[in-house]
Amino acid sequence: MKFIAAVLLVALLCPKDSTSLASRLSGLLGGDGILGGSGLLGGLGKIPLGGRLLGGRPDDVLREDDVLGEVGGRPDDVLGEVGGRPDDVLGEVGGRPDDGLGELGGGPNRLFGGSRLFGGVEKVVAGIPLPNVADVAGGLPVALPVSVRRRRALGVVGGLPVPKLPGVAGGLPVPKLPVPLPVNL
């Protein structure tokens, strides 16, 4: 209990910038990732504390770009961020911005043959090329249910479209949803 109280006190007192101790506590307490990360699926969710968000900025749950919470002290775009930079659509892996549907191992994915989304040759999962695979949830390739433009409005959780949410308010995390099987492998 003393440790939890100390963590909450530090989160309230630290500055709002993404390098603050409070922002790092979000990764420490909930994990830093797209599925199961702090403020995302199965993580801490948003914890309003006197106008502050544990490990991030104030709980501005009505922001247009705020769908499933914050990670690392910055507002998320759709499904949060990994590596300290804002995500493009479904977050990033390896500390670089994603190329439309996220990255694996720090390199941009190539999907369907071109320069961005629908612009590449293949998606690489754990070193294995998987053509015509949309995104990866929990290490598993999942089908792309809607277009990326619609996903910016809807958001995608575990490969399933979900209504746009005003963040994860009141400290309630978003439950995990079933992950569909990959297609066109």
Curated annotation (Swiss-Prot):
Record's keyword annotation contains Translocase: no
Primary location class: secreted
Any one Gene Ontology cellular component term annotated for this protein: extracellular region
Signal peptide: 1-20
Subcellular location: Secreted
The protein's role, per its UniProt record: Has a hypotensive activity.
Protein known as: Celestoxin
